[in-house]
Amino acid sequence: MADNIGNKAAHDYHLDVPVAQEGFYVKGAAHCDYGMKSRLARMFHPKSGNAVMLAFDHGYIMGPTAGLERIDLVIPPLIPYVDVLMGTRGVIRSCISPAQRVARCVRVTYDATVLFDEMSNGGGIACDIENAVRMNADCMAVQTFIGAPGESRSLELLARTADTGTRYGIPTLGVVAVGKDMERTEKFFLLATRVLAE
């Protein structure tokens, strides 16, 4: 039985002090659940709300890429300077130590390689939510092709990944791909980033 001695002060609930309502510094994420906020907090700096992401997922469409031939040698020395690493599950598992204190964004889609003129056709899910959870991913990245023939399919993949990620508290990142024949203009990027945010 609990000791009754000294428990008279246990009824002081400080009703005159309001409960702290802590805001959340990542824009648009104040309504998210605990798991989602926890993962976002690992990626974004609390003072600036910004993040430095180092992406090395190029090999999944480009094959061997100059400067990234030995990811196990070139990426780990850069980790102290970044907030988030983005790569495919295979590269992250084989080249990045799970003991590294850095957020991980896993590329979860596949797309056509650079061997095809139209790279926006033929994409799909390469890493499902179970694999993302098993890897303790802080974010899932989906390639999108705004203004290309595969736009609709890529946005469908983004929406379904966001639905699944929300269910498990894992944020989804929409990555904007600029097609070979598309101009890299401010107007294009304003349109593309707004579409992905919506």
Which residue stretches match the model-derived regions?
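N-terminal amphipathic alpha-helix/helix-capping segment at the start of soluble metabolic enzymes
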Residues: 2-56, 90-103
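Alpha/beta enzyme core
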Residues: 46, 51-53, 59-114, 118-198
